[in-house]
From Swiss-Prot:
It is a multi-pass membrane protein. Disulfide bonds: none annotated. InterPro entries: MFS_dom, MFS_sugar_transport-like, MFS_trans_sf, Myo-inositol_Transporter, Sugar/inositol_transpt, Sugar_transporter_CS. GO terms for molecular function: symporter activity. The keyword Transmembrane applies. SUPFAM superfamilies: MFS general substrate transporter. It comes from Arabidopsis thaliana. It is found in: Cell membrane. This is Inositol transporter 4. Highly expressed in pollen and phloem companion cells. The gene is INT4.
Length: 582
């Protein structure tokens, strides 16, 4: 049926999906056309990681001000918060198809503005427009696919949206790598997003509106016509009847609680089942962001440079691994989430995340401790005014290399020109400038400004990849699944919307603060901080989030009516009652 129980994407359903879409390619056309919104979502959140490296080269103020770098990245997230919040109203008022078309226009405007930006503030404006589109696409694309898919394969089709998001991120890294040596590098990287937006806009013009939205607007004949193209003739009447009952029930609920946003919000927080559902739903969404995942996706080339790889091209090539692993993890999740359960996958994922973050903190700490020393003679071999001002007094007195190292040099906002003999040998601490970088390179040396040459760099890449491997199948996809199941039917849209906004707000906080945190605490301290946040998140997931695998919506509602308690607390409570009875 169009409305009802949980749509699961199990092995049988995937087989049925291929069989049905082979017989009725129109269904796949609907799903893939709408799914381009997920691809755009992933592309625009991932492309900035590589583009930022070259934006810093073109604009000195961006290179010198970490808050400006953070703002360029996070303004898309700020726009997404608004896009997701307003998107719900646009979806209900103008329809799913129109919402996707509006999102495409916003994507295109943002891409054009960024591609031709003459100054950093114009890039920020473009990122805000892109954010509006991302926010709308994040909620509209899966909604359209769900409402325009046959029930028996809905789970399989909707689950591809998550795969397209991670696929879009992977595609963005490929594009970044492709334009490394092209004049205008970052302008091409950011502008390419306009191409799939145009493609989706054209495709959606020839596709229909969601049959559910049409029925809700009393355009019943149009709704039937679409269902007749999706379902076999002998199933259309049953679908129409299910649609009728669902819409009538929805209207009856609105008559009781009112259809205004404030009335629905009051009804939700006055309902203990919804409150407990929101506690679980918001917990998993906030935890998803505070494990630090989007700092890895947004800043992975920068993190690779923190690990000691100076080349932009090398950094982007290595960070391509993280996005590829993320996409692979989405496929793994689709295979196992209905076999092992949502709660178990998230808890296992969180344990792995915490372990990887602690190891990464240790690796970066050791890299900082064992960073190459600064040699006074090496620093003086350049022009008199080329030595870093903070190190100049030590260079003048010919201080021994043990006094300063590369990491201290970089924290003084200077650059490190590695020894031409061996990159880990003592080098020079010099002024941070393009001229100095060119001078250093002309002598056959490597210039470092974001990280120091390190023997630990390979370990950092390995555990960064392992972090993605343990994140993607659990905390990467399951929070969205939980939020589609945890709320009563009449509050699912509102509850999911509140949880989605909490996700984007958390995303904004983390992405806006990451570079400032690495500047203040170092990479090691920042990863350790995320490990602490992840530990807190693990505790609240264990405490508040029930297992919803295999449960119908009514069963989830009954579970939340009595309140969820972890098995450990239930056993202790039972033991306490037995002692009292004795």
């Amino acid at each position: 049926m169009v409305e009802g129980g949980i749509a699961k994407a199990d092995k049988t359903e995937f087989t049925e999906c291929w069989r049905t879409t082979w017989k009725t390619p129109y269904i796949m056309r609907l799903a893939l056309s709408a799914g381009i919104g997920g691809l755009l979502f992933g592309y625009d959140t991932g492309v900035i990681s590589g583009a930022l490296l070259f934006i810093k080269e073109d604009f000195d103020e961006v290179d010198k001000k970490t808050w400006l770098q953070s703002t360029i990245v996070s303004m898309a997230v700020a726009g997404a918060i608004v896009g997701a919040a307003v998107g719900g109203w646009i979806n209900d008022k103008f329809g799913r198809r129109m919402s996707i078309l509006i999102a495409d226009v916003l994507f295109l405007i943002g891409a054009i503005v960024m591609a031709f930006a003459p100054a950093p503030w114009v890039i920020i404006v473009g990122r805000i427009f892109v954010g509006f589109g991302v926010g709308m696409a994040s909620m509209t694309s899966p909604l359209y696919i769900s409402e325009a898919s046959p029930a028996r394969i809905r789970g399989a089709l909707v689950s591809t949206n998550g795969l397209l998001i991670t696929g879009g991120q992977f595609f963005s890294y490929l594009i970044n790598l492709a334009f490394v040596h092209t004049p205008g590098t970052w302008r091409w990287m950011l502008g390419v997003a306009g191409v799939p937006a145009i493609v989706q806009f054209v495709l959606m013009l020839s596709l229909p509106e969601s049959p559910r939205w049409l029925y809700r607007k009393d355009r019943i004949a149009e709704s039937r016509a679409i269902l007749e193209r999706i379902y076999p003739a002998d199933e259309v009447e049953a679908e129409m009847e299910a649609l009728k009952l669902s819409v009538e029930a929805e209207k009856a609920d609105e008559a009781i609680i009112g259809d205004s946003f404030s009335a629905k919000l009051k009804g939700a927080f006055g309902n203990p089942v919804v409150r407990r559902g929101l506690a679980a739903g918001i917990t998993v969404q906030v935890a998803q962001q505070f494990v630090g995942i989007n700092t890895v996706m947004y800043y992975s080339p920068s993190i690779v440079q923190f690990a000691g790889y100076a080349s932009n091209k090398t950094a982007m090539a290595l960070s391509l691994i993280t996005s590829g692993l993320n996409a692979l993890g989405s496929i793994v999740s689709m295979m196992f989430v209905d076999r092992y359960g949502r709660r178990k996958l998230m808890i296992i994922s969180m344990f792995g995340i915490i372990a990887c973050l602690i190891i990464l903190a240790t690796v970066f700490s050791q890299a900082a401790i064992h960073a190459p020393k600064i040699d006074a003679f090496e620093s003086r071999t350049f022009a008199p005014n080329a030595t870093c001002s903070a190190y100049a007094p030590l260079a003048a007195e010919n201080a021994p290399p043990s006094r300063w190292n590369c990491m201290k040099c970089l924290r003084s906002e200077c650059g490190f020109c590695a020894s031409g003999v061996q990159p880990y040998a003592p080098g020079a601490c010099v002024v941070l400038s393009d001229d100095m970088k060119a001078t250093c390179s002309s002598r056959g040396r490597t210039f470092f400004k974001d990280g120091c040459p390190s023997k630990f760099g390979f370990l950092a890449i390995v555990f960064l990849g392992l972090y993605i491997v343990v994140y993607a199948p659990g905390m990467g996809t399951v929070p969205w699944i939980v939020n589609s199941e945890i709320y009563p039917l009449r509050y699912r849209g509102l509850g999911g919307g509140i949880a989605a906004v909490s996700n984007w707000v958390s995303n904004l906080i983390v992405s806006e603060s990451f570079l400032s945190l690495t500047h203040a605490l170092g990479s090691s301290g920042t990863f350790l901080l995320f490990a602490g946040f992840s530990t807190i998140g693990l505790f609240f997931i264990w405490l508040l989030v029930p297992e919803t695998k295999g449960l119908q919506f009514e069963e989830v509602e009954k579970l939340l009516e009595v309140g969820f308690k972890p098995s450990l607390l239930r056993r202790r409570e039972k033991k306490g009652k037995e002692v009292d009875a004795a």
